[in-house]
């Protein structure tokens, strides 16, 4: 068979599998050196067995490992016997299907050999091209099979494609699918090259829906629209449309060289892949498989392999109409400092680096040109084109040390879609991506110029603080200074925009939540940039907190470097400039929890609604009631967050998704409200009250009574007060997070008020601060850690899934230990377990245990029988003793009672008379045993009825005649005879051996009882 031949199961495959040179099919089959000619059908030949019978008797064939090698192996061959088995089992064979050879006791290896012989003969006779001289077949097939079991499948049936296709065309079509848009991008030089780097994934649909300055061929538009259908029509065939005309449009070698072998060089480097449905319009199939993270090539290889056909420029083109650039596109300070980088290096930049690079340029340009911001105040969301130097500069800032080595599977696309409903209501700068419902370009930074202007207005006042203020994907108050003014009953600097400005239009993109963030601001220059690695956004995600690896959770970061983009729990309260939606009374003051509806849905409503629907929120009207204060929901919004918060925050997020966020309507003042207020303030801003007490309360102090002393949120004016804030925040946060986590994981809505002031001491010396910091590993809890939890008790501080797993593990351990103890006890109890010299298995132990139990039961039964017999003998002896004692006189005087004496004398006479008569004839004993009850033992017996005290013979004769008339009847004698026969058959072996009856009688005569 040729090497290109399709091999089905059951084939004999190859004659010489070790040969490199494959013989031509039309040539003669090459025979190996065999002693037995009968094995040629198994090795390489199908000739007839017409050799000498002497060859049939030789049991060995020598199998060589190739033509040019001298090694050989001896194989035991019994194919002549197998041939006889075939002829016996099948006189006529019709098909070469697998045969079990039922009725023949064959080893499974022999059955495989027989089926291989049958297939080989069938292949030579019907399938193979016949050579010049036809060979005599080994097996005769009566009729070739009509079924298509072993026929070569010539046409692939794929979703309605029933035509026959060539393998080259299928391969070419598959390769075109792998890089399906490359050909279109080469022809359309002006288009954006979408390589799905970390900085941009272009949406072809967004391009097509915008107005073009030049015409596009209709075929290109149709192909693009066909490739990027929304997911409602995902039931359609995913197979690309078959077009015979362009099947060989370009050379196959060019297709083969697109993805080079350089992909395998850096498989260990992690790469942040977006959601697969968000990059549904991406053009590269390799990055549409985010689940196979370690197997993906790095983006540098994709860029370099496609580098010849791509324009050497960033993926944002200012000359095209794909984006609108703002008017302040003048060279800024950073444009002259950051050098031009190579394009291929830019592909490894993550989302965070793109945000930082653009934020640097935008903040500098905003500071230098504050007057131009008023022109863009009306534009709510505006695409911003990244400059080439920003695009290149962001490529060298990637740090893979803190990126996860595997992508968590807990962030499902459905979760991301469900958390998107309030995304467009937020006025913070966002990143739009093309989901199924998107019509605009993806991953493009969209800036809210109104927010930026307001942010700029505070830059002069709180410049160091605003530099430290970080973007928080958790529910955040983006502008701390504005919230501070609200909480201090001061009027806001900029009036809140109207409701109509906040609501998006129909053309706004449907934003995924995992790309929403506030705009990151530049970090202070005092910190070493190499010491501030970027945390991946999924590390802080509440959706992935339960499945993180222990290393990713328990990695302690420097205190000053907790500045990466935070995670997307969704902006529960973020839509106006101050971070709240004002509905009703806009009077500044405390925020009241109410059931009124607004435009931003909560996370619980998002998780329970369809993807597109937008429900109401629980954060409603802001009334002039300063009793309740709802502090910032940010997790790391203070200037110097400590590493203590990482683990506790992950535990809070893990538990809050399951229990605490499932609230639809919360009434102020209820325990539910208090617990919710405690749960969402895992790390609230530090509350300071003018009271003299130094006690800082725990989570129960979040709803504070502020009628006399309205609290304020301290925002440090400079970086010099960081250490004081850190020392002041360290100890309260420990207890606050612990109690909050315990309450959340227990599911209790009542918040425990911690009143002991000793629990909340403030560390004043560096030694105390170090002691608090050293307790950090005790507070860390990784929900996905497996080995560390095995030795812990399933207390209430664990995640419910982890608690369930630990309980299940303990139950399994108890079950296995009970089984082991039981088997150990059996091995100690049962004798002769080690008689074979080998340690017995559990099955042997159980089998011998059953035998031992049966033997013990048999012994118990035998001993029970002996005990019963002994009890019967004791009973008879007691009766004998009783009868003898009853016959004794009551005194030494002569007895006057003659009745008892006469009965006893008659019994004694009967026994003596029976013994004497049985010695003469053994049959006399048999008759006496039958008559003994009626004569002696019964109450109406002869001995008790006949008057023995009378000296008159007439009276004795009269009593005898009366007794005979009453008792000597057949009805009385028949039961006695049957009872005797039953006792003889039971106590002796007369039924099997009747000759032993005389011996039995003699043995009973010797018995004293």
UniProtKB/Swiss-Prot annotation:
Q: Give the span(s) annotated as Disordered.
A: 1-20, 304-354, 488-531, 686-728
Write out the biased-composition intervals (Polar residues).
324-350, 499-508, 686-695
**Which PROSITE patterns does this UniProt record tie to the protein?**
BHLH (PS50888)
Looking at the record, the residues that make up the bHLH domain are 803-856
A Pfam family annotated for this chain is HLH
Tissue specificity remark: Expressed in intestine, neurons, muscle, hypodermis, excretory cell and other tissues.
Annotated region Leucine-zipper: the residues are 856-877
Show the stretches that span the lipid bilayer.
Answer: none
**Phenotype on disruption:** RNAi-mediated knockdown reduces lifespan, which is further reduced on daf-2 or glp-1 mutant backgrounds. RNAi-mediated knockdown causes premature onset of polyglutamine-mediated paralysis. RNAi-mediated knockdown increases spore levels of the microsporidian pathogen N.parisii during infection, on an mxl-2 or mdl-1 mutant background.
Location in the cell reads: Nucleus; Cytoplasm; Mitochondrion
The record, for SUPFAM superfamilies, names: HLH, helix-loop-helix DNA-binding domain
One of the record's GO cellular component terms: cytoplasm
Keyword Chaperone (UniProt): no
What InterPro entries does UniProt report for this protein, alphabetically?
Answer: bHLH_dom (IPR011598), HLH_DNA-bd_sf (IPR036638), Max-like/E-box_TFs (IPR052207)
Listed A to Z, the keywords are: Cytoplasm, DNA-binding, Mitochondrion, Nucleus, Repressor, Transcription, Transcription regulation
Stretches of Low complexity bias are at: 511-526
- Gene Ontology biological process terms in this record: determination of adult lifespan; negative regulation of transcription by RNA polymerase II; regulation of transcription by RNA polymerase II
- Entry's Gene Ontology molecular function annotations: DNA-binding transcription factor activity, RNA polymerase II-specific; protein dimerization activity; RNA polymerase II cis-regulatory region sequence-specific DNA binding
Write out the function statement from the record. Answer: Transcription factor that binds to the E box motif 5'-CACGTG-3', probably in a heterodimeric complex with mxl-2. Involved in modulating longevity in response to TOR signaling, dietary restriction, the decline in protein homeostasis associated with normal aging, germline signaling and the insulin-like signaling pathway. Plays a role in autophagy. Involved in regulating migration of the ray 1 precursor cells in the male tail, acting in concert with Wnt and semaphorin signaling pathways.
Q: Which PANTHER family match?
A: BASIC HELIX-LOOP-HELIX ZIP TRANSCRIPTION FACTOR, LD38259P
Quote the protein name from its UniProt record. Answer: Protein WBSCR14 homolog
